[in-house]
């Protein structure tokens, strides 16, 4: 397993879906993360990037779907998601970054 030092290499992208958008009200955020990262690395990276206090981290490995192509079958890549719950007094994360 390779060591990942930069927090922006661990957190790849936020997951924007109906379910994850509904969880934002409960201070729960979902991110696509590097497949080799662990919960401790994810927690430290979120705290450094967004300057918040993380309460808990859950991870889920998602297998890539098998898809048909013109010449046969291909496979989408597998991903890892992190469901991050922020501490009670923590400020919310601005995922969209729109200037006011």
UniProtKB/Swiss-Prot annotation:
Keywords: Ribonucleoprotein, Ribosomal protein, RNA-binding, rRNA-binding. GO terms for molecular function: rRNA binding; structural constituent of ribosome. One of its GO terms (cellular component) is ribonucleoprotein complex. One of its GO terms (biological process) is translation. Part of the 50S ribosomal subunit. Contacts protein L29, and trigger factor when it is bound to the ribosome. Belongs to the universal ribosomal protein uL23 family. One of the early assembly proteins it binds 23S rRNA. One of the proteins that surrounds the polypeptide exit tunnel on the outside of the ribosome. Forms the main docking site for trigger factor binding to the ribosome. This is Large ribosomal subunit protein uL23. It comes from Mycolicibacterium smegmatis (strain ATCC 700084 / mc(2)155).
